[in-house]
Amino acid sequence: MKKAISMMLATAMAATCLAGCGSAASSSAAASSEAASSEATSAATSEASTGEKTFENNELNIAVFEGGYGSEYWDEIIKRFEAAYPGVTVNIQISPKIGDIIRPQIVAGNVPDFISMNDNDSTGLISSMVKEHALMDLSDVFEEGGIDDDTPLKDQVIDGLLDSAKCSPYGDGKIYIAPFDASPMGLVYNKTLFEENGWETPVTWDDFFELGDKAKEKGIALFTYQGIYPGYLESMLWPALASATGIDNMKAVASYTPGSLSSDEALKVFQNMAKIGSDGYLMDGTVALNHTQSQTDMMMNKALFIPNGNWMEGEMADAPRADGFEFGLTCAPVLDDGETRYVMSSVEQFEIPANAKNPELAKEFLRFLYTEDSVKLFAEKANGIYALKKANEMVKGIVTDGVYNMNDIYQEGTFMVFGWDAMPDTSKVVIADSVFNVASDVMNGDMTAEQWRDGIEAAFEEIAASK
């Protein structure tokens, strides 16, 4: 469950300082003659050397969260960076528990120069750094051209991303967090099953439930989700609300603005979500399942849709599935045909701490990560796609067909991200409790759509009162 589980839990964890200990794989990737002789590395070396940059401090210390993408990309990109900048040494700490590992180091003043870690990580480290204004302003990096493309980096990144709370957490137009990849999220389905039955993916909520009635006749549920990890529902709820209430209103939601979900249109979305459970469209047993169980059931054609992202293909590579199963991804339903459909994106992130000892080399490393060579390497080693406009075409034929095809959802809907603004220091609200942790109650009929919506609005009121 690579990305979405803790998306809505970050706020709850942000105030928790975990001074956990652990061991990270630590290495210094030295440039080898073999790496330097490779065509890709030679190209990167030539590109980077054009600027003939030198640095007073040639040692770069980076900390990387090791998630579903693994470590191979990082091992190789470090070799290529060192080859491109002779004399530079990169020391890496990489671990699934990197937040717990580097938190005590940061407290002790041993701050990494560069971090690859998300603001929704369960340790709450990056969220805490945002609250404490402990991240460096990276706006100058994105105003500059890239290493291998003179276009300013800000114009190379997918539209709307740098302006979002994921990259500009204070809403002041300054970039403090850099985007890594932007994986599309939505409703995963089996393209083969739809083709065999002549079904079209639904556009409106009416279409969605009509399709559910057809599926019932074949003994297939319309919908399932990762029951005990309800945060996955974000890839359906937020785009649906954006379509119904307007994308600008989602900025108000993200900043906990009272009344931002009080409209009739917003309520209709909550009612449609609740209808999945109340009217028998939810796969039996869903609320008790974990992510792998529910995803496997969907892949066995027990349900038409499950909310997830394009990483599901890799995550479920060894899972059983229906014969001929082919991954597809479609947008959340809209209230009325003609409304803008949105594609929620799960964004992984890079940071440079405000008190990094070698910020200039860290910034150059960040620029190096956005080169075409790096983008293709990430696709090759991790089956991932950078958050750049041209990245999907750069990696065609490198990433799997499933990932490439699911990225085509951007042709169907408009890109959006959703990230909560920094919670006021004075607030004790756990926003996840009101938004997604009540999902099982809603689906079981123990909470109405109105109560669900009103509970979120009450949380917003409490947050506003604490400011």
Features from the language model and the residues they span:
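Extracytoplasmic "Venus flytrap"/periplasmic binding protein-like
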Residues: 80-160, 192, 196-200, 301-305
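Extracytoplasmic/periplasmic solute-binding protein
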Residues: 49, 166-180, 185, 209-258, ...
